[in-house]
A protein has these predicted regions:
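Hydrophobic/aromatic-enriched cytosolic interaction surfaces used to assemble or bind macromolecules
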Residues: 1-323
Length: 323
């Protein structure tokens, strides 16, 4: 009997590596291994792996202690070096769209395009003011230097990166399975970026990414640095919530002015121990229902570990297995 292919989906943050090894048997996904490994300060900064030796030690320990078997990885990226922009282009044949998007991408991306790897997903169709058909796309641009660093360091560790994908898109794919077709928004915060996206089915109607501003950086960083034991100061959590409240309220207001169909539900995603408190306080000031998504219920039924913090890892692993 041929060996069943598996792949490890992983996400790298400033403070830790999270990973899930996934396979597909008889049409169903199965978790083979799952775990995380803390990273020492300075190993990963601003999305870049700064200390390859210590990173290699950490990921080797994770693979060993978690009984991971595969050497193939799909990596989810979610930091300030990944830019997402919503754009519209005149509708053309599918085989011409890619060239059009890549030729005009610089108009939407505020960093020299030669420094970025650019991809896109089709986000629906509409018409402009002149009733001309338009194709909406979500542009995804990641710094080439960061991506090449990941590939080179994994290769030096005798690991192969088979795919690199956006964590935010991985979240969308997971939520599409549980949202019952409603128009939903995602609020996703990490230690260096705040993401918003509005989705219904396969149509994306807004995307916004904000680098955590200097006034909030220290508080947000402390909340995430101590996310597992909750040892952050209450004032840092309150400052983080205040920042989230301000940006989320303004984003919802802007979206409502630009769109006729309202957001029906908001999903809050963050890898902190304070998610429930954050959602509770946001809900006091935001009229749209907010909840923490319960990702992959069929997989959760076979796991004693909550899967929320591993959702991006699972999402990129599934995408890679599906090819």
């Amino acid at each position: 009997m041929a060996k069943v292919k598996s792949i490890i989906g992983c996400e790298i943050s400033t403070n830790e590596i999270r990973a899930v090894e996934l396979t597909k048997e008889n049409g169903f996904y199965k978790i083979l291994a799952m775990g995380y490994m803390p990273l020492e300060e300075g190993v990963v900064e601003e999305g870049f792996i700064r200390d390859a030796d210590r990173f290699n030690t950490a990921i080797t320990q994770l693979i060993s202690s978690g009984n991971f078997q595969s050497t193939d990885f799909a990596v989810a990226v979610n930091n300030e070096n990944v830019l997402m922009r919503f754009a519209s282009f005149p509708k053309v044949d599918a085989d011409k769209l890619r060239n059009m998007v890549l030729l005009q991408a610089q108009e939407f991306i505020p960093i020299p395009i030669q420094e970025m790897e650019v991809d896109y997903v089709v986000a629906g169709e509409t018409k402009d003011d002149d009733d001309t058909p338009q194709t909406n796309v979500m542009l995804i641009a990641a710094r080439r230097q960061m991506l090449e660093g990941y590939i080179n360091i994994f290769t030096a560790s005798k690991l192969q990166i088979q795919d690199i994908d956006s964590s935010l898109l991985a979240y969308c794919r997971g939520i599409n399975e549980i949202c019952n077709g409603v128009k939903y928004g995602i609020v996703n915060i990490t230690d260096d970026v705040l993401n918003y996206i509005v989705v219904q089915g396969n149509e994306i109607s807004m995307v916004r990414s904000i680098t955590i501003p200097e006034r909030s950086q220290k508080s947000v960083a402390k909340v995430f640095a101590n996310s597992r034991d909750g040892s952050f100061e209450q004032e840092d959590l309150e400052a983080t919530i205040s920042f989230l409240m301000q940006e989320t309220s303004s984003t919802i207001s802007y979206y409502a002015m630009q769109n006729n169909i309202p957001i029906e539900k908001i999903y809050f995603i963050a890898n902190t121990s304070a998610n429930e408190k954050i959602v509770s306080e946001l809900q006091e000031n935001i009229y749209i229902p907010i909840e923490i998504p319960q990702f992959y219920p069929s997989l959760q039924s076979t796991s004693v570990t909550p899967l929320g913090e591993y959702a991006s890892c699972i999402g990129v692993a599934i995408s890679s297995l599906e090819g």
